[in-house]
Amino acid sequence: MIRLKKCSLIWLTLLLLLIATAVNAAEKNFVEIDIYSVNDFHGHLRAEAADPGIAVLSGVINELMKQNPVGSLLLGGGDMFSGTIDANEYQGLPVVTAMNKMGFSANTAGNHIFDYPLDVIKRQAAAANFPILGANIVEAAGDRVAEPFKPYVMLQRNGLTIGILGLTTVETKGKASQFNLQKVKILPPEQIAQGYVDELRRQGVQIIVLLTHIGSSQGENNGITGEIVPILQKIHGVDAVVTGHSHLCVSGTYGDIPVIQAGCHGEAVGRINLLYSIAAQKVVSANSRVYKLSELPRVQDNAMERFLEPIFKNIDSKYNEILAVNSQVLTNDRNGESRVGDFFMDVLKNGFKADVALYNGGAIRDTLPSGRVTVRDLLKIFPFDST
């Protein structure tokens, strides 16, 4: 009971703070817009280890968006549909359905969307209640945006027209399945972005958000660094930037433009708050924040949990066969040498009687636990069909 009261008090405090801001905005003829974002979810639907699971992620986002229901939107920063057997077994569709239930307004294409062939991506797009954006993903034989991607979407929130322009990293060309990329090409984002920004402004859009799957980070003074910076140097007229790809928690500004990234696997939610002046016809104030779910009261979406139960049950019955017993934990480190990587490279080298075994370290995604090892444990370590 004490914990319940404490959790309720935290949410009430957040609610009162944002209501106060909204009232202040109304009194001064301002409009408040809240942009919430999740990126690099990688199909982590299930709650386990450090992953909160999408039922909790959905519950927390529902609570946050109640604070400004008419002025909030939820965006996906790419790499959402693949990366676990729970998602991959169904070609990403459980994630699409979950995002529909959560009310996502748009999702940008990340490099890992091409873990799937283009015909599967088209089925994902057909199942989604939101557009999959990718202004710089064009047809291999021309310059038209490739189907099923859209360059942008225009949304209405709190009386304002908001343009969401989607961009993906050029690293897709070297990181995605070459077979699945045959019918598309990835243009440098800065080559096409300004033209679309200008097009949106001509259509009367009042706020423009770059929804990107492009890496960002922060330096010593919290300045924005990373792949996104040279792109922003060549674009003007945007009001907010959502990033992804580098799996970091980022909250800062480039110039006076808020830039956000919310880690990975649903561990966090990004929020950009914009205050738009009706009189000045522009954004006059902006701030950003990353909410780590581990630091917020746990709120579960029970309807989401019920939707997932049969999916998890089917996966467990199919992939929980015990293959071996492991005597020690083999840890993983994506940024350096790791015990699990060393072990499996030895397995490859010895199995093929080779002198050297080479593997994409970024595709090794989990630790091998001690105790019984199942097929699902191995698929958590090597989740991508392309590797």
What is each stretch, according to the model?
Residues 319-339:
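Glycine-rich phosphate/diphosphate-binding loops and the adjacent beta-loop-alpha structural elements
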Residues 372-387:
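C-terminal catalytic subdomain
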Residues 2-11:
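Bacterial N-terminal signal peptides that target proteins for export
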Residues 25-309, 313, 335-351, 357-359:
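Acidic, metal/ion-coordinating pockets
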Residues 219-224, 369-375:
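Short glycine/threonine-rich loop-to-helix capping motif typified by GTGT followed
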Residues 189-191, 339, 364-373:
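A general structural motif
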Residues 11-20:
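Bacterial N-terminal signal peptides
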Residues 289-292, 325-330, 358-368:
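A glycine-rich phosphate-binding loop feature that marks nucleotide/adenosyl-phosphate handling sites
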